[in-house]
Amino acid sequence: MHVDTLVKNVRVYNAYTQQFIASDVAIDEGRFVAIGHSDELESIQANTIIDGQGQQMIPGLIDIHLHIESSMVTPETFSWALLRNGVTTIVAEPHEMANVFGIEGIKAMIEASAACTVDMKYAIPSSVPATSLETTGGAIGIAEMDELMDTEDIQCLGEIMNYVDVLSKPDSKTNQILKHFRRSYPALPIEGHVPKLTGLDLHQIVAAGIGSDHTHQTREGMEARIKAGMFLEIQEKSMTDDVLSYLIENDTREHFCFVTDDVMADSLYKRGHLNVLANKALAAGMKFEDVIYACTMAPAKRMKLEDRGAIAPGKIADFILLAEDGQFVFSAVYKDGMLAFDAASPYKQTPKPRQFPPHFYESVKLAPLQEEDFHVVADRQDGIHVCRVMNVADGSTFTKETQERVPVANGLLQWQDSDFRLIATFERYGKTGGRAHGLIAGDILQRGAVATTYSHDNHNLLVVGANILDMVCAANAVIQAQGGCAVVENGEVKAMLELPVGGILSEAPLAELAPKVESFVKALTALGYKHYNPIMSLSTLSLPVSPALKITDFGLIDVNNGQVVPLFVNEKS
């Protein structure tokens, strides 16, 4: 037998026996063709021989639940970053680009992925818009779903975010999509988003065809999901001692995998990707073989990627040579049998500019804002209003509602004389001109202002501030840049993060973007914003499926009841 490549003297992880076995590995036309002891493969001739020097060899890592746009980079940049972190296959859901450009945005992401080294499979965004209580640039319905199914890169239906409609509105758009997908594409998985659901509600979700959950987990919640036949996708925020101990102590190998979901650009550059979660699981005491399985074979099975996830005959030759035994530290990463990353060699990125259609760089259709745009008009000249207030807490993206007294003078809410800050959002697609104002408190900025078009999921212009002048300055900096994030204090832009592709992505190399993201976070933190992930906290203030009180261009949203509620609760003189 003659093959392209023969990897000699390695200890191969066998996903089926959970063992490392001293072997040689033959590869031809990008796939494994034989794995065995050197004397078993001695008749094989190869164009290239790689000396594995006794290193451990594991499959390329697979992440089946993530959003490229969370890193604010293009697929090309994302692929570059993934390879040095051992990830060779992903299933990405581009619901941010879908919210901005609809089906055109999804197709553009798929096209931008075509030349990437990493295999980028896609989930069809199922919740665009996430609710009917916001204005987005695009929408995905059954017709768009069917059109996308003609694309070979589609692997599943993306996370069903509006679980409230699934449970309580049989004729809702969400349920129509679910029923159509199950009937038309029964072999494909459906991803879920069901935080804290248990009991009958959870069983209704599973019965509707939703087969996984990637939200924050607890021991009790995991047990309930596994018993109901639901697959667990464990992201880093769920990797508590309690959760990991449950996974370690119980026979859960076939019921979970690790996923990243959202990774900020600075974290992607400095910390890594799925390998970060893998090493965290190891540190908690999970067996090395089980961690490998949770990052390779388990996700491949969940997504029915039967051609990968193991080093076995016929599988795609994606593999990693480990620099340290029993650790996710890589000396080399191979994709389709070809070297993609070598830790001993320079690894530089040369990104391509203007990878998207011209109008993707002109998506913010807002005129410059004025001070009057941030005036909150009351229905009386003077007095006191009881107002709903969004309360932000470090450690969570949930925002609690409180009701507080705020003075009114000359027909305007005097929020600047209170303990609260102003939050405002402006529809930026040129569709409705909608806008809304609210009050916000808690672990947020205490002075200055911040503005962003990176605001889940509608990506309208979101502004939070302690004074109107800085809010105007921050908003206009973002508008002028055609999208991004700006921090302003005393009329001076302290940090600017340009995101010109749809107002949510940058084409800069990761090495350039990551420090800008870090500077933005530092500037925001310097104004008093307290959160373990300030960008995620800020950007989800407009996410109307994340409890409990959020804001969109429709107004304040009571998430638990799925309805718009007024800022003013009642009046007192």
UniProtKB/Swiss-Prot annotation:
Molecular function in Gene Ontology: adenine deaminase activity
Pfam families on file: Adenine_deam_C, Amidohydro_1
EC number: 3.5.4.2
Keyword set includes Lipid metabolism: no
A GO biological process held by the record: adenine catabolic process
Required cofactor names: Mn(2+)
Database matches in InterPro entries: Adenine_deam, Adenine_deam_C, Amidohydro-rel, Metal-dep_hydrolase_composite, Metal_Hydrolase
Presence of the UniProt keyword Ligase in the record: no
Keywords: Hydrolase, Manganese
Domain of life: Bacteria
Catalytic reaction(s) noted: adenine + H2O + H(+) = hypoxanthine + NH4(+)
Annotated HAMAP family: Adenine_deamin
Family the UniProt entry places it in: Belongs to the metallo-dependent hydrolases superfamily. Adenine deaminase family.
Protein name as catalogued: Adenine deaminase 2
